[in-house]
Amino acid sequence: QRILIFAHLSHMYQDGASIYVTFLFPRAPDPEDTLLFWRRLKERASQTIVEAGGTISHQHGVGLDHAPYLEAEKGHLGIDVLNAVCKTLDPKGILNPGKLLTTTGSTYQEP
């Protein structure tokens, strides 16, 4: 299957730049198959970025799509700090419970 990949650089810094990537590919007859294909592309691209020492979030935050890579980017200490902040500011755990961080400190994983 042919995939067109477009990219542009944005937000240039001394130590790097933001690369925005768009994938174009034929949609499958079943929308679920199209979504699955896109998720696989995104997963492979995200893994490649993290393995190369890049970040996958930039100024837009993390969100559920990037949550599986949060610990790889922030490290165990970063996750511990985020959990401590959440527990301090939201001791009852009522703000988006179980979405990005859990009480065990691991990041969200899709079911």
Task: Label each residue range with its predicted role.
Residues 1-111:
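Conserved glycine-rich FAD pyrophosphate-binding loop
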